[in-house]
Amino acid sequence: MYIIDIDIEHIFGTNIRDFRRLPMDYKIIAVDFDGTLCFSNWPELGVPNTRLIQYLQAQQAAGNKIILWTCRAGDALSSALDWCVEQGLCFDAINDNLPEIVELYGNNSRKITCDIYIDDRNMLPEAVC
């Protein structure tokens, strides 16, 4: 496994700033919990995906924003957040768009606005790290 960054310009064949039309100077990365950050089956907590966690920490250190986007709610979400703190991972938003995105569009869409979405049912963690 390698830690890489996705070349969105190469994939879409255009300048990412023109494609997204977002005035952000950073990437927004949304990540799932179960099977992605944590190798577990809901509602249990399991082994951390340390390579992905290190990748996300490096992205935050570079100024990018991280959103936890999970189906967990209530106590299961609280347990997952505590687990993430134990791993040294914190989020800019949890199951929500960033405030600056809500302000930009004038509403809070149910669809998450992000540049990269990492989910075991969408993009395998191995594809980015």
What are these regions (language model features)?
Residues 3-129:
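HAD-like aspartate-dependent phosphatase fold
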